Amino acid sequence: MSRGRINDRRPLVIGHRGASAYAPENTHAAFRMAMDDAADGIELDVRLARDGVPVVIHDATLDRTALVRGEVESCDSTELTECRVGEWFNLRHPKHAQESFAYESIPTLAQVFESYGSRLIYVEMKCEDAARRPSLARAVVELTRAHGLAGRVVVKSFEHDALSEVKRLAPEIRTAALFGRSWPRPLVSGARIIAAAERCGADEISLHRSLLRKSTVEGARGRGFDVLVWTANSPFWLRRAFALGLRAVFTDCPADMHNWYTHHIPGDAGRRENG
């Protein structure tokens, strides 16, 4: 079985919500910083606004990042893109605060595609309401196709039914099945993870680092999956990812991780072609 696996000397370094250790997550500032920091790509979260426009934000509410009360799905995209989502970062991380961060707003997915479509983009669909997942999947597929990015966008989600819908609509778009800390780690087997990924037709398996085991990786690769790990913010996880031959690591600090690879991986560890 082949799922278009991409092999190379080292895992890709993907900015998790951009360079989110040093700039407000899921903002242009974080995405630009990740690109400037030699990340191979960026990762972001999308939700549907009330008017059906995919917007880039992790939480279901605005409380944490916009410092105002409200639910994302209860607001139109025009309202959401006016929300400032950087001041919270300055307050929580004064060491990395910048005055300009306070003016960062919620981007739309279309804006991200227009600005960063030359690089690899992992789009995580967030939707707790199962009834709305087909609409979110359709909107992401339509934007990906409209921008000609089927070869550079990978759609991922914990909601595997949403990934099945993406594959039904657009078999050419790669998808990644997410598995997080909520899985019962002492009990879950690699076989269960692989079976779940196969059921939704995923191309890649994205594991929380607590689920990263050699047997799982080998089993997944034997079934044709690429394997990813999140969130890797220390050299320990980079060494592990390299040793296991993972496709990518998701990190909040891409500059630090890229520099570590550059200085510790023998041979050509520079940026590789994104598939």
Where are the predicted features?
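Phosphate-group recognition and catalysis centered on beta-loop-alpha active-site segments
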Residues: 1-275
